Amino acid sequence: MSLSKNSHKEDQLEEKVLVVNRCSKVVKGGRKFSFSALILVGDGKGRLGYGFAKANELTDAIRKGGEAAKKNLMKIEALEDGSIPHEVLVHHDGAQLLLKPAKPGTGIVAGSRIRLILEMAGIKDIVAKSFGSNNPMNQVKAAFKALTGLSPRKDLLRRGAAIND
């Protein structure tokens, strides 16, 4: 049996649980729990997605979050030599995120959530600092906004923008 192109692509994707949250509702018979999960999906080569889902069972929330993340996949075009071409500062709600390119061998210098996103995107050398809100969803959205807003080096050179080497 041969595999279709889509199933082959999905096999390469790595899925990580970023945050799991449990909520409880007090009802007549006791407490009723529900779960929410924030899931990251990436291939380490520039394809990245995130998904958020809720369910009454933890495994269902994780499964639904993974499906949502695969539907939300995006390609980060501006990656080069394991880093980003320029510095970027992004705001999303209360979260701010600063990403700076780093020299080869530096590694990923970032907090745990942002580090996981950058690793799954395939970035090897970068310095990141988050300010403001540490709400996981806001940090993830800020990171995706920063990564999708990057301009490739050739576009910057064509415009005549200054680039630090």
UniProtKB/Swiss-Prot annotation:
What gene codes for this chain? rpsE
The source's domain of life comes to Bacteria
Any GO BP annotation = translation
Spell out the molecular function terms from Gene Ontology. rRNA binding; structural constituent of ribosome
UniProt note: domains: The N-terminal domain interacts with the head of the 30S subunit; the C-terminal domain interacts with the body and contacts protein S4. The interaction surface between S4 and S5 is involved in control of translational fidelity.
Keyword Zinc carried by entry: no
User: Which GO CC terms are listed, alphabetically?
Assistant: small ribosomal subunit
UniProt keyword RNA-binding present: yes
Sorted alphabetically, the keyword list is: Ribonucleoprotein, Ribosomal protein, RNA-binding, rRNA-binding
Annotated function: With S4 and S12 plays an important role in translational accuracy. Located at the back of the 30S subunit body where it stabilizes the conformation of the head with respect to the body.
The name on file for this protein is: Small ribosomal subunit protein uS5
The record's comment on protein family reads: Belongs to the universal ribosomal protein uS5 family.
Pfam families for the chain: Ribosomal_S5, Ribosomal_S5_C
Summarize the subunit comment.
Part of the 30S ribosomal subunit. Contacts proteins S4 and S8.
Q: Which Gene3D superfamilies does this chain map to?
A: 3.30.160.20, 3.30.230.10
HAMAP family assigned to the protein according to its UniProt record, in alphabetical order? Ribosomal_uS5_B (MF_01307_B)
Q: Where is the S5 DRBM domain?
A: 13-76
PANTHER family reported in the protein's UniProt record:
MITOCHONDRIAL RIBOSOMAL PROTEIN S5 (PTHR48277:SF1)
